[in-house]
Amino acid sequence: ITTRLVGSEMCIRDSDMLTLVISELYKKHLYLLDSDKVDSFDKEIVKQLIQGTASAKDTKGSLMLLTRLMYQQYGKPVILLIDEYDVPVAKANSNGYYEEMLDVMKGLMQALKDNQALCFAVITGCLKIAKESIFTGTNNFISDTITDSRLNEYFGFVQSEVDQILKDADVLDKAESIREWYDGYHFGDFDVYCPWDVMNYLLELQRNPKAKPVSYWKNTSDNAVIRSFIDYAGSNITGKLETLLAGGTIVQRVDENLTYDYLHSSENNLWSMLYLTGYLTKPREEDYNGKLADGT
């Protein structure tokens, strides 16, 4: 399930978007309505979730219910994948209904707590999950971020993958321009390319071999949190941004344990947010010359 669509103010007032997301999820499991392993009471709740007429309580408990019913159906613990868990929380924080959204998300995340039907869950988001209060009471998290080394090569395309893609597409002559435009990240020992940018540019090259690289990723992100920082930026922040835009380097302490309700409590949180969400990256050791901007 992806919670990306859940996050408009309408969602908080009448749960329209959440109801739609859950309905679409349950439509993929219509077999439960015909199963002799699901009792009539649960089938009625499933029908209501599909139709969008379920109570708020049943909607919040829908992930817990679905994992339990799938376990009953197949006799195997369920793997739960939740994509972009924090998009609704970020949007709510930007629009003034953070606490209400936390209540909604807490209900959904009950599926992670004391759930005998759950094998394990994989959750993705911009901010580290351990401290966000929607996960209160959930134990045994293993959190991997871009500052760790275990999964660095999986955050995007590494150089060997890009080389093979360009070879397969017969556009090896574009390697240098693609590196300059889309090789924007350095995680551990890996240079990492943005897959969305690379694939969109290759698609455009198939249509027009003379196409120039452009930034495709910038149109897919919600920049409300970043803009809110910039709106209140003082001269210190402005100066550092100018240094970065000029290709320079600044030194800032990165705090991985951010929560959205405290994002604006310090300037350092801005740099942490920019780094954790991919707007900034750390320099390669061979590119770092030790020269720092004043005040860093």
Regions found by a protein language model. Name each.
Residues 79-83, 119-126:
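Structural recognition of the conserved hydrophobic beta-strand(s) that form the central parallel beta-sheet
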Residues 133-136, 144-203:
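Amphipathic alpha-helical segments of the small helical/lid subdomains adjacent to P-loop NTPase cores
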Residues 1-7, 11-12:
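Single conserved hydrophobic/aromatic residue that forms the stacking wall/gate
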